[in-house]
């Protein structure tokens, strides 16, 4: 029994340290140094939460930029069902999904160039991706501008404005947050697209 006391004391100490002190300390430091990120990077407009800068949303209207397809089951962009489709690149079902998406994208974007950006036809690993490359966003500009009756140049300027660049080139590539961009389009016109 004497040998159990140090083991029990060590276990209790580590339980309090890793189960109490460490989580409370990291939460407090996160709230202090990075409050926006620690609270989910929520986007507020008119004192209402419109979304998160980290999770994509399903935009299907012609007047909105469309993000990557969601691989979440039942409901698109469901954060509770996050995960990829798990279909191998050699799986015929994946090929059929991509071909179907490409055909739908070409039909919805008749003014766009013939080459559909790959990220618009393939789901991300999480199924919740909120970012596109500037090229994939630019590919959709003619459709969005026509649906909103805005000059193409004005929509292109908005895409450029909402393109986030990494601190250094080797840290990643520029991306456009589709949720932020679509909210900016709504703010520009003072209403939601149809």
Curated annotation (Swiss-Prot):
It is a single-pass membrane protein. One of its GO terms (molecular function) is ATP binding. GO terms for cellular component: plasma membrane. Keywords: ATP-binding, Cell inner membrane, Cell membrane, Ion transport, Membrane, Nucleotide-binding, Potassium, Potassium transport, Transmembrane, Transmembrane helix, Transport. The keyword rRNA-binding does not apply. The chain crosses the membrane at residues 12-34. It comes from the Bacteria. InterPro entries: KdpC. The keyword Transport applies. Its main location: membrane. It is found in: Cell inner membrane. Pfam families: KdpC (PF02669). Part of the high-affinity ATP-driven potassium transport (or Kdp) system, which catalyzes the hydrolysis of ATP coupled with the electrogenic transport of potassium into the cytoplasm. This subunit acts as a catalytic chaperone that increases the ATP-binding affinity of the ATP-hydrolyzing subunit KdpB by the formation of a transient KdpB/KdpC/ATP ternary complex. The system is composed of three essential subunits: KdpA, KdpB and KdpC. PANTHER family: POTASSIUM-TRANSPORTING ATPASE C CHAIN (PTHR30042), POTASSIUM-TRANSPORTING ATPASE KDPC SUBUNIT (PTHR30042:SF2). NCBIfam families: kdpC (TIGR00681), PRK00315.1 (NF001454). Belongs to the KdpC family. This is Potassium-transporting ATPase KdpC subunit. It comes from Salmonella dublin (strain CT_02021853). The lineage of its organism: Bacteria, Pseudomonadati, Pseudomonadota, Gammaproteobacteria, Enterobacterales. The gene is kdpC.
């Amino acid at each position: 029994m004497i040998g159990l006391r140090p083991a029990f004391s060590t276990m209790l100490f580590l339980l309090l340290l890793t189960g109490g002190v460490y989580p409370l300390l990291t939460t407090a430091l996160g709230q202090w140094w990075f409050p926006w990120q620690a609270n989910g990077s929520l986007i507020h407009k008119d004192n209402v939460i419109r979304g998160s800068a980290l999770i994509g949303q399903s935009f299907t209207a012609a007047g909105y930029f469309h993000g990557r397809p969601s691989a979440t089951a039942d409901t698109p962009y469901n954060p509770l069902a996050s995960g990829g489709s798990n279909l191998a690149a050699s799986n015929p079902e994946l090929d059929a999904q991509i071909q179907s998406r490409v055909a739908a994208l070409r039909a919805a974007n008749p003014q766009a160039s013939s080459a559909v950006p790959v990220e618009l036809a393939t789901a991300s690993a999480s199924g919740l991706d909120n970012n596109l490359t500037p090229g994939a966003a630019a590919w959709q500009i003619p459709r969005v501008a026509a649906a909103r009756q805005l000059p193409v140049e004005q929509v292109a300027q908005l895409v450029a404005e909402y393109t986030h660049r990494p601190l250094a080139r080797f840290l990643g590539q520029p991306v456009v947050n589709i949720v932020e961009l679509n909210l900016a389009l709504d703010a520009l016109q003072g209403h939601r697209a149809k």
